[in-house]
Amino acid sequence: MARKTPIERYRNIGIAAHIDAGKTTTTERILFYTGVSHKMGETHDGAATMDWMSQEQERGITITSAATTCFWRGMDQQYPETRINIIDTPGHVDFTIEVERSLRVLDGAVAVFCAVGGVEPQSETVWRQANKYGVPRIAFVNKMDRAGADFSRVVGQIRDRLGSQAVPIQLPIGAEDNFQGVIDLLRMSAIYWDRDEQGMTYSETEIPEELKADAEAAREEMVEAAAEADEELMDKYLNEGELSHDDIKRGLRQRTLNTEIVLCMCGSAFKNKGVQTLLDAVIEFLPAPNEVPAIEGLLDDEETVVTRESTDDQPFAALAFKIANDPYVGNLTFFRVYSGVLSSGDAVFNPVKGKKERIGRLLQMHSNQREEIKEVRAGDIAAAVGLKDVTTGDTLCDPSNKVTLERMEFPEPVIAVAVEPKTRSDQEKMGQALGRLAQEDPSFRVRTDEESGQTIISGMGELHLDIIVDRLKREFKVEANVGAPQVAYRETIRKQIEQEGKFVRQSGGRGQYGHVHIRMKPQERGEGYSFESKIVGGVVPKEYIPSVDHGCREVMEEGVLAGYPVVDVGVELYDGSYHDVDSSEMAFKIAGSMAFREGFMKADPVLLEPVMKVEVVTPEEYMGDVVGDLNRRRGTVQKMEDIPNGKQIRAQVPLKEMFGYATDLRSNTQGRASYVMEFEEYHEAPASIADEVIKKAS
C-alpha cells in the first residue's frame, strides 16, 4: 500500500487548556467542520464525542487523552487535503501527567485560553511542559461571547505571565453579547459566520470603520514580527516598509516553528465562530512531522545516540504514549510512529522490557469510534490491540533494528490513601484492577504497607485518587473503603558526616564479614541520590562495591526517621576492609545499610513536606476571610492581583493543611470563590509537625 497523504500534509497537534477554557467544545467543532461528526456534542449535556469514559461525561471534564484523525482542505478549499491527528489533553492539574505524555508525541499545539479567565495556573504548567519539549504553538482565545471577555488582556497575560512573544494575527469584532466575528490581519478583511448555518458558511467584508486604526496598528506589529525571521525579510521590510502576503506567512511560520513567537487568534467555539480560521492556521503555521527535529534514541549498547528521521524507508520506531482499557476490544496501546512502516501481524520489539510482541489489530481512533487499518507509517498516530507488556513511555521498534527512544520522566506522587476491599471476592479483583490502572497511568502507584498489610495507592491529588477509586467501582466492579488521605513526606539530611558500618558474624562454619566507611552529604533539593566509590588499593574488592550502594538504596526506600523515602543524599565509599573467605555481597550490603542508617541519624536529619502552589479567585468582599484562612493553614501569600469581578490570590501552602479546603472555601465565600492547586516543591517541615509525624510512625 502506498501512502495516502504525503507526510508534509500531516499535522500532529494537541489541544491543551485550562479546565474551563472550552477545549472539548473547540475539539468538537473541529470534528464537526472537518466533517467527521455530524451532530455537535456539547460538554454540558455530557455528550461530547471526545470525552469517552463515563466519569468524564458526568464530571464534564476530560480525563483521558483520546486521539482522533480528521481531514481539512481549508475554509475556501484552498489547500490539498491535510490529515490532522488531534490528541485531546486534560486540563485538570491532577492529570498533568497526561498532558506531559501527549506533548511528548505532538509536533505542535493549540493552547486554548478563556477570554474571561485568561492565563490560569494550569496554563502555566502546560506552557512549561510545552517549552520543555520545544512544541510550537498557536493561542486560541475562546469564549469571546462571554461577559467580561477581553482579547487584549489575555494577549498581555501570555506576554507577562508566560513570558512568550504573543503576536495577534486576528482581532475580535465586538465582544461579549456583541461578539460578531474577527478581523483577519493577514488579509485585512472582516469575517462573519452565518449563525443559521451553524457557522458552516461565512462572509468576508471590509473592516468596520471604527476598527481600522486598531487593525492597522496590530498588522504593523505582526509584519515586524514576521520580518525578524531572517535577514532577507528584514532588509526587504526596511527598504520597502511592507512585506508581501507570502513573505509574512513565511516569516510567521518560521518563527512559530522555532518557538520564538506565539500567534494569537480568537473566537467562540460554542457560538461556531473562529474555528475554521483556527484550522487554517494549524495548516499554515504548525509543523509537519518532517519539519521538527528528528527524534533521538539509543542503540542496544546504551551509548550510541542515533536519530530516526520521519520517513517510511527508515527502520520502524514508535513511542507508546497511552494505555487505555476498552470495554469491547480490551487493552489499547496508543502509539506515535516516528519512522518506518508497520503492518498488522508484524512483530515489534520493546527494548525497555526486553520483549518481542506481535501486533494484532491496528485501529485508527475517532474519539470512541474506531476504524480498522492494515498499516501505519511515519507520522501516524494509531492504537494497537493486544500488546501485553507495554507501559506508557515504552519504545516499540523493528526487532532487527533495535533502538530505545527517549524515556518520558514522570513526577512522584504527593498524596496517598489506604484502600480496603469490602468483601473477600473484591480482594482478588482489586489487586488485578489496581495493577491494570498503574500500567495505564505512571503517576499512579500501588504498594502494600508491610506492617499493616494495607494497600496504599498514591497519586497527584485528591481528584486523581477519587477517579481511580471510581474506576475500580465502575470498570472493575470492585467495592472499596477508602481511608483518610496521607501526605507523602520525604526525609533528608542537613550536614556532612563520616560513618563506619561493620557486619561480622564468625561463629563456626562459613562466616560473614563486611566493613565500610562512608561519607554522607546533603545534595541540592531535587538532585536525588548519588553513590561514588573513592576506594583505592582494593581495600574493598570491586565486586562488593555495588552491594554497598544497594544497601544504602534499600534503607532510603524504607526511610529512617519516620518510614518515608530518603531523598537528596550523596554517599561516598572511601574506606573499608574485607576477609578472603567470609566476605560476600550480602555482608557488604548489610554493612552499607548499617552505615547509612546510623550515619543518617547523626547527619542532622529532617522531614520534608510537599508544598502546593495555590491560586484562589474570590469576590473582593471575601478577600480578608480567604487570606486569613490561608495564613491559618501555614500558607504564605505571594501575590494578589485585581481581576474583573474580584481578586486573584497566589500562595504557597503545605499539602497537609489543604485537605478539605474546597468545603471551607465554599462556606467562607458562599460558594463564590474557586481555587486550583498543584505541587510546587518540598520544604522542611516545622519541628512541631515533624515530631508529630515521627511519633505516629514509631
From Swiss-Prot:
The entry's keywords: Cytoplasm, Elongation factor, GTP-binding, Nucleotide-binding, Protein biosynthesis
Pfam family, one: EFG_III
Domain tr-type G positions: 8-290
One term under GO cellular component: cytoplasm
Bilayer-crossing regions: none
GO terms (BP aspect): ribosome disassembly
Residues the entry annotates as binding GTP: 17-24, 88-92, 142-145
GO terms for MF: GTP binding; GTPase activity; guanosine tetraphosphate binding; translation elongation factor activity
InterPro entries assigned: EFG_II (IPR041095), EFG_III (IPR009022), EFG_III/V (IPR035647), EFG_IV (IPR047872), EFG_V (IPR035649), EFG_V-like (IPR000640), EFTu-like_2 (IPR004161), G_TR_CS (IPR031157)
Subcellular location field: Cytoplasm
Domain of life: Bacteria
Family: Belongs to the TRAFAC class translation factor GTPase superfamily. Classic translation factor GTPase family. EF-G/EF-2 subfamily.
HAMAP family: EF_G_EF_2_B (MF_00054_B)
UniProt cross-references to NCBIfam families, sorted A to Z: EF-G, PRK12740.1-3, PRK12740.1-5, small_GTP
Function: Catalyzes the GTP-dependent ribosomal translocation step during translation elongation. During this step, the ribosome changes from the pre-translocational (PRE) to the post-translocational (POST) state as the newly formed A-site-bound peptidyl-tRNA and P-site-bound deacylated tRNA move to the P and E sites, respectively. Catalyzes the coordinated movement of the two tRNA molecules, the mRNA and conformational changes in the ribosome.
UniProt-recorded name of the protein: Elongation factor G
